[in-house]
């Protein structure tokens, strides 16, 4: 509802990460969608949101090279002020090749390697935003919680990640791999480490950033889909 094009696009980007990080080859997506009444009191807004959502899904999916093979759509007054954009992702991986989102038992002394889009201030507060009751008067202030999508970079990252996984399997290297979702670096690093009873030292000055003078708490907690 806040920025429907970007919101839908990053929804696709997020679900692709979830499946990719398990070591799977992504093969398709699908989208069950719920919108408000296109003939009701908010019909103009509903139609605008629906069009932007569809364009966002198509724009990200086409650029990243993953086909959308299905979904469904329903319209109801209950979704006038808060649409629902569900995203499904299908991937294929052999059970023995599944990669987990926690550090292996032998990971003492391992480095944490962060790959992807340079960190900026977009997506900061995304986890809290996801739990908010949306209010139209807060629309502008909520924009910063939604990331700016870059599906062409995501396409490159997916292919590079496939290559990393293949090389790790060939060399017998055990690793943990996790997408950097809401909460950014702080969330993903703590989850990867704590699940295996490890701690980690995080030097934020070594994080690649695209904006000058970002406060440490922004670097630590911002999020993008790439």
Regions found by a protein language model. Give the residues of each.
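Glycine/proline-enriched, intrinsically flexible loops and inter-domain linkers
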Residues: 1-226
């Amino acid at each position: 509802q806040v920025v429907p094009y970007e919101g839908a696009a990053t929804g696709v980007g997020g679900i692709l990460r979830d499946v990719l990080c398990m070591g799977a080859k992504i093969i398709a997506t699908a989208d069950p969608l719920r919108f408000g009444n296109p003939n009701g009191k908010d019909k103009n807004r509903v139609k605008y949101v629906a069009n932007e959502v569809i364009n966002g899904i198509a724009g990200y999916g086409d650029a990243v090279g993953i086909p959308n093979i299905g979904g469904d759509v329903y319209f109801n007054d209950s979704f006038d002020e808060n649409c629902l954009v569900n995203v499904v992702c299908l991937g294929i991986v052999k059970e023995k090749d599944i990669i987990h989102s926690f550090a292996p038992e032998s990971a003492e002394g391992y480095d944490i390697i962060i790959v992807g889009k340079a960190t900026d201030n977009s997506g900061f507060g995304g986890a809290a935003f996801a739990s908010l009751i949306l209010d139209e008067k807060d629309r502008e202030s909520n924009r910063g919680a939604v990331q700016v999508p870059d599906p062409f970079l995501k396409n490159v990252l997916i292919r590079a990640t496939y290559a990393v996984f293949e090389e790790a399997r060939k060399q017998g290297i055990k690793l943990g791999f996790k997408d950097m979702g809401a909460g950014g670096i702080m969330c993903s690093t703590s989850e990867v480490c704590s699940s295996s009873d490890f701690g980690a030292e995080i030097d934020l000055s070594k994080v690649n950033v695209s904006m000058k003078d970002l406060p440490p708490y922004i670097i630590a907690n911002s999020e993008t889909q790439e």
